[in-house]
């Protein structure tokens, strides 16, 4: 797991043999512009170009008083894997963590959808898509609350749950689509059952001649690995943790001297990703995927 701190944003990157996830926790600071920065948690998955965003607000109504953070616990440091293959079909994968509120928090907005949908909301006019939001299901589960959404493919389901620990100060309250969490720690699970990608390791994404970069620039090569998969290279994190045809081709051209070639290499992944998404009718190249 990698942790990059850039207050008020805390970025966490987690990947294993089952899935890759990025989690961004935003907790306003005293000098933050509260008109554009509010407490939120984002989960982004390169598989399916999908994710989750949750916006919280202080029950007191006083902006800037609610602080949230990920805490190290027995389930992760702070992130841990979520894996369940008991339902048949694609395994349900994702991340889990312990989320801490310093005061009573109200979940005001939750979006379970494509990264494009989430990005448009966070950076645009904050408009909610009714076709996405209408599919959300809120339910009470033992010790907490669960939010789920069935994708338009009628197969994939994204699920978010928060459950109390012994360090919370009262019960969770669900009122329609508003959820109130007393101050304390909560187990946070974010998962989905979409087919997963195969990540390229640092050794696989770089050419043999460039392997020394792994020791010379470990953070950069680890980041490149997180964005690279056998069937596509993603454009960035978190807002662009998806396929972008133009960006992928330009990046491949610029990085060609150090990228691996041939079967299973990074250059092949870029070309394969572009070819797979070419419009069969007019030959145009797909600019961006919006699956989730």
Predicted segment positions?
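Extended charged low-complexity segments that act as oligomerization/scaffolding linkers
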Residues: 282-292
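Terminal accessory carbohydrate-recognition/targeting modules of carbohydrate-active enzymes
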Residues: 1-249, 253-265, 276-282
């Amino acid at each position: 797991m990698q942790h990059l701190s850039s207050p008020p944003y805390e970025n966490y990157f987690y990947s294993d043999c089952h899935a890759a996830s990025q989690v961004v926790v935003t907790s306003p600071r005293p000098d933050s512009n509260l008109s554009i920065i509010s407490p939120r948690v984002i989960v982004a998955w390169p598989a399916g170009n999908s994710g989750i965003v949750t916006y919280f607000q202080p029950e007191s109504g006083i902006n800037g008083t609610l602080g949230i953070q990920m805490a190290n616990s027995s389930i992760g440091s702070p992130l841990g894997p979520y894996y369940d293959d008991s339902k048949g079909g694609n395994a349900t994968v994702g991340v889990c963590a312990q989320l801490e509120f310093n005061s009573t928090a109200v979940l005001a907005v939750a979006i379970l959808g494509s990264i494009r949908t989430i990005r448009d909301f966070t950076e645009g006019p904050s408009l909610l898509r009714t076709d996405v939001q209408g599919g959300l299901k809120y339910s009470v589960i033992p010790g907490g609350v669960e939010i789920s959404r069935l994708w338009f493919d009628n197969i994939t389901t994204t699920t978010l749950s928060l459950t109390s620990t012994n360090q919370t100060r009262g019960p969770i309250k669900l009122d329609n689509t508003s959820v109130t969490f007393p101050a304390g720690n909560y187990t946070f699970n974010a998962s989905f059952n979409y087919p997963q990608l195969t990540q390229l390791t640092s050794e696989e994404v770089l050419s043999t001649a460039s392997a020394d970069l792994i020791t010379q620039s470990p953070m950069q090569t680890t980041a490149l690995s997180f964005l690279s998969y056998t069937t596509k290279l993603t454009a960035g994190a978190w807002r662009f943790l998806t396929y972008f045809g133009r960006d992928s081709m330009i990046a491949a051209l610029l990085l060609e001297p150090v990228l691996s070639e041939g079967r299973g290499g990074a250059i092949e992944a870029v070309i394969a990703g572009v070819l797979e998404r070419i419009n069969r009718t007019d030959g145009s190249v797909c600019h961006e995927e919006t699956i989730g």
